[in-house]
Amino acid sequence: MNTNFKNYKYALEYDTDYNILPRVIQQALKASWLETPSKNNFMPYKVHVLGPEFAKEKEEMYWLCLGNETKANGNIITDREQLRQYNQTHDLPFYDNIRSAEYVLIFTQRVETMPNQLQQRLIDNGYVYEQMATDGPKKEGARKNAYLEIGMFSTNFAGICLNNGIDISYTLCFPGDLKDWPQEHFSFLDSHPMLIMTVGKGSRYRLASDQAMDPKPDFDCIVNIVKKVK
């Protein structure tokens, strides 16, 4: 069992003077790719890795997240100057750590165009795989599967990072439509973003007192041990 999350702390800010060896991130990503199972071995997602040199893109991501926050709260703000004013008058969001993260991962859906030998043999025999659909209900079905597998990959990756003394966080407060991500900064994206993950060495963490007031739901609320009715 992966116990690396036992001492997990939410990093509100990362140490910009601390440098993670690129090979450590590369090895963690490769191990996650190798160890994460996938339905029919399609892995219907892509992980876009932004390193230290992508400071402008990370800054832009922060403002995209903040704009999405205003939308979620029923007060949509798209003007950047108005967003800056909003930023000054509201509590700093947890996803502010995107700006200082050494690495940021953006997960998107991936459509398979080059099936492996076994997959192709089954396709020739009449099998239809939703992971190869380019639109319609089947692509949406593959998207749901991608969400699940992204969770599995990101958990494996997080466990490896935490085991190496590297902090991580997850962000879902961002525009879910690719058209809202400016091409001048995010031309590498080829599908709607599904998850953002930050990676680095934390310099400031969520207060223990806040954490104590924010427990998970009770075990019995989440896990239902079904008993046979006689």
Indicate where each model-derived feature is located.
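Small-aliphatic-rich amphipathic alpha-helix that forms the alpha element of a beta-alpha
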Residues: A28-L34, L105, V111, R121-P182
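N-terminal amphipathic, basic helical "cap/leader" segment at the start of enzyme domains
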Residues: M1-V104, Q109-R110, M114, I225-K230
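Short, acidic Gly/Pro/Ser/Thr-rich loop/turn segments
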Residues: E112-P115, R204-R206
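A generic local secondary-structure boundary/capping motif
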Residues: P93-D96, Q183-S187
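A short secondary-structure junction signal
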Residues: N116-Q120, C173, A208-S209
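Short secondary-structure junction motifs
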Residues: F42-Y45, N163, D167, M194
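A glycine-rich helix N-cap at a beta->alpha junction
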Residues: E69-T78, E184-D210
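Phosphate/diphosphate-binding glycine-rich loops and adjacent basic-rich segments that engage nucleotide
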Residues: A208-K230
